[in-house]
Amino acid sequence: MIIQSKDITKPVRESADVCIIGSGCGGGASAKVLAEAGKKVIVIEEGGYFTSGDFDMTEQTAYQNLYRQRAGQSTDNLAVTILQGKCIGGSSTVNWTTSLRTPDFVLEQWSKIFDVGGLSSKDLEPYFDRIEKYLNVHIEPEENHNPNNRIILDGARKLGYTAQASGRNTRDCKKAGACGLGCPFDAKLSVDVTYIPDAIKAGAAVFANFRADEIDVSGKLKRVFGSVVDQSTQKVKTDFIVEAPVIIVAASAIHSPALLLRSGIANSSGEVGNHLTFHLTSAVLGVYDRIIYPAGGIPQSALCSEFLNKNNDGGGFWIEAVPVYPTLASLAIPGFGNGHKELMRQYTNIGASIVLVKEIDSEGAVKLNDYGRPSISYNFGGRDLEYLKQGLKLAAEIHFAAGAKRVMTLHSQKTEFTSPGEISGVLANAEWGTNEIALYSAHPLGTCRMAEHPLRSVVNSHCETHDVKGLFVIDGSVTPTSLGVNPQMTILAIAEKSAEWIAENRLKKM
């Protein structure tokens, strides 16, 4: 069952074998595994509960109901916009369905540098196999790629680079283009229509609009204290307490460390909130003399990853298509006044690609502000900046190869090319400082780092905190490094594997 704040009229007191904070990939997968193992599971989610009938394919509704800060969450200096879901299903409800396995070189690095055990490619293969079957992860046939994805496939191949289709977790996709706004057809097999319903079927209880404020681990039973929030007004209605011997924090790489910091727990290493990575992202736009319509069709089904770890340094970049909805386009498209209006009038003829950087020199941190909410910082530079420049150059070349008449980046000062020969010179003279180029992330990672040494990490290889037995963090915050792929498959696999370990080793007798 799903209990919403509108159903609550008095303080809530509950107990369970395990309380899971967050209902995205980490929390949802953990809930299903543990509920099906016969454990009493309670999931609490700060966001609301919405179904396909609530998804009207408009940005106004989606940003208000499904995203953190109405899609306006950012670093403190406003340099990086951070897109995260805040609803049952978490970010899986609003992602673009790309489903990729963790690269082998990343898992090898985790083992060699951080002594992570049990997460090799061989260890995770059965989990990936099972998840891909469960979520119907598949490659789209050639005829299903929309014009925006064809830019990458056709343009990269014309230049002699490798581009390929990417896996997607959908079934009977209607190609409506609304993945980022909530799928109105339940065709996207996100956590809200897969793991959460199956967890409920196995006996789990899910509470929507329940915000975890603090965790107390001082007693025999751990306790989660929080607030029941009205979905419409966002005002606190009452409070809740959930008691359980096992707590799983699965609130994302931004909000999991914030919760631990507010609670004053699991931080003997001083590492809670550190090592934030973003897969820092910017975009390249091409203007064509044909209709592209960047918000139509399957939003993301192709990529070029040839330059990921090409120098064997663990870094690099990859390029994907990005669906550009009108409101998002109006914010991202460079220029002011008549120039901006002229570009928006050509909206249907614009193709958009994103460059995502797998950081090796850059990282940030999540701390607490004066109100106990996340304060997010990020320092970008070194080899990562060079990879971003290389990626933007390649993406621009791909657009020209695909037939674009002019191409632009998202610099605050006009940065536009009318031929491939102009790209290098224009980018060399562009400004790259803070807020000089629009930067984004939908993949915050790493703020509760996993490693076997307790002085350099927050959790061990089973996602259990070094400091508190029975307290786990299971979400994107545990990755020791950035991934180089969209993270949902990695998080799901780690969650399923860790939840199995919890059932066998921490809840065996329950």
Identify the function of each model-found stretch.
Residues 1-18, 36, 76, 496, ...:
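Extreme N-terminal leader/targeting segments of oxidoreductases
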Residues 60-140, 355-365, 369:
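Redox-cofactor-proximal catalytic regions of oxidoreductases
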